[in-house]
């Protein structure tokens, strides 16, 4: 919902404009359904509710101070030189669903006892029902020296995890011809856990195209113990890593970057390592920052002890405040935080919200479906699809075989089809992930 602290100076003019606009909003407003966050989850929820015949009179509001909406899965394409930044962003005002009231307000806390959200602009917004979709914070400042390195174009340090840094990734890949390249993934929960290695595989592929691959020593340094959380795909990616001569530095979490000395410092998380510091010299460094719940969410009454909005993993309903639901990256749903996951969460949330409004039992169930279209090079992609428990749930296995094998068809889905689908169907409430444009049955059939 907001700019990363490390990049906030660039956002100041927009904030002044929003404060001016907000003065025309009454100090107190009320809507039947209030959605906090106009990212993929919030927009899609608003659109599906607005399209729903079960809601009756539509009175939906969405709160988000952003001026631009980003198709974040497209940032890997931008960093790989396959798309321009303009291709993967739109003015937020252009994609708010018709009939939905947009308030460009910055929420700073939730007041669930009074069915209210409070904003920095002094406006209190009350609701009958709340959908919390605040997203998460990409914490660039969580790595010492990283913000400064990212602001120096000569540092050879870059990241696909912000619209303000992603274009530098492709420039760095093109300019790099020889030396030590390190790609990092932090420990803990992040958005799209496959993205840190997607950009690595695409860089490797580009360097191979340019004939310089043999002059570059590549390391994948991850805080995780394996290449991927789902065993089936992790095994395939580990085989690919070894086949392509990529060094694996597992359970090593990046904690500091010295751009001048070209040194990255990691904390060894392995059992018995006692958190020892490990330093690695680099000539090229791609960093994925640590990520966490927004502080204002974590400190609120609707957050659990881990800081995420505390909801039932099957119904998406809050565990304490029954008129609150949460989806997307800011929720406690224990799955991969991806756009594909949101495509499966929203219909469940909508059906359960409508059931609650009608005084009925909440029967819709989210099974944890998520997908990671994992680029492994030009003209190839591993389409990882799975549900809770790391159980594969593959859409195209009957056609192409097991999806752990990279496929050119999947590559063009990611590169050409999915961006079009996102802008023309997904955020308009007409896309349902593996069900495509057919709305899924969200209530499990009784055997």
What are these regions (language model features)?
Residues 75-82, 147-148, 155, 302:
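Short glycine-enriched, charge-decorated loop/helix-capping segments at active-site entrances
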Residues 205, 342-368:
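Internal hydrophobic alpha-helix adjacent to the cofactor/substrate pocket in enzyme cavities
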Residues 150-177, 281-344, 354:
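FAD-site-proximal beta/loop scaffold in flavoenzymes
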Residues 25-101, 187-231, 437, 441-446:
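Beta1-alpha1 glycine-rich phosphate/pyrophosphate-binding loop at the start
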Residues 4-30, 100-198, 202-211, 286:
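FAD-binding core/adjacent interface of flavoenzyme oxidoreductases
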């Amino acid at each position: 919902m907001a700019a990363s602290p490390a990049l906030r100076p660039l956002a100041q003019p927009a904030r002044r404009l929003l404060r001016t606009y907000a003065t025309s909003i009454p100090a107190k407003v009320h809507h039947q359904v209030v959605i906090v966050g106009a990212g993929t989850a919030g927009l899609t929820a608003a659109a599906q509710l607005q399209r729903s015949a079960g809601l009756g009179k539509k009175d939906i509001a969405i709160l988000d101070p952003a001026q631009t909406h980003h198709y974040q899965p497209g940032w890997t394409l931008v960093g790989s030189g396959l798309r321009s930044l303009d291709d993967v962003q739109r003015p937020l005002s252009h994609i708010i669903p018709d009939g939905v009231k947009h308030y460009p307000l910055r929420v700073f806390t939730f007041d669930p006892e009074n069915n209210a959200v409070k904003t920095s602009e002094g406006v209190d917004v009350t609701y009958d029902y709340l959908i919390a979709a605040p997203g998460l914070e990409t914490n660039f400042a969580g790595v010492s020296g990283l913000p400064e390195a990212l602001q120096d174009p000569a540092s050879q340090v870059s990241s696909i995890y912000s619209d303000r840094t992603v274009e530098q990734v492709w420039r760095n890949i093109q300019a790099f011809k020889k030396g030590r390249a390190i790609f990092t993934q932090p420990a803990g929960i992040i958005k799209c856990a496959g993205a840190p290695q997607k950009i690595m595989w695409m860089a490797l592929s580009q360097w191979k195209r340019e004939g310089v691959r043999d002059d570059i020593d590549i390391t994948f340094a991850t805080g995780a113990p394996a290449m991927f959380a789902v065993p089936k795909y992790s095994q395939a990616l580990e085989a690919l890593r070894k086949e392509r001569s990529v060094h694996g530095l597992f359970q090593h979490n990046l904690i500091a970057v010295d751009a001048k000395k070209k040194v990255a410092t990691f904390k060894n998380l392995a059992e018995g390592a006692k958190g020892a510091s490990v330093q690695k010299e680099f000539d090229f460094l791609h960093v994925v920052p640590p990520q966490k719940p927004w502080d204002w969410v974590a400190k609120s009454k609707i957050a659990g002890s881990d800081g995420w909005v505390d909801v039932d993993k099957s119904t998406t309903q809050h565990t304490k405040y029954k008129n609150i639901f949460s989806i997307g990256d800011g929720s406690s749903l224990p799955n991969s935080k991806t756009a594909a996951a949101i495509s499966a969460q929203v219909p469940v949330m909508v059906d359960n919200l409508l059931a609650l409004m009608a005084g009925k039992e909440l029967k819709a169930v989210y099974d944890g479906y998520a997908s990671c279209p994992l680029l492994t090079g030009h003209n190839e992609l591993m389409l990882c699809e799975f549900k809770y428990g790391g159980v594969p749930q593959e859409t195209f296995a009957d056609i192409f075989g097991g999806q752990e094998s990279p496929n050119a068809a999947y590559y063009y889905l990611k590169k050409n089809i999915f961006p079009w689908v996102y802008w023309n169907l997904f955020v308009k409430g007409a896309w349902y992930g593996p069900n495509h444009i057919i709305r899924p049955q969200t209530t499990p059939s009784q055997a």
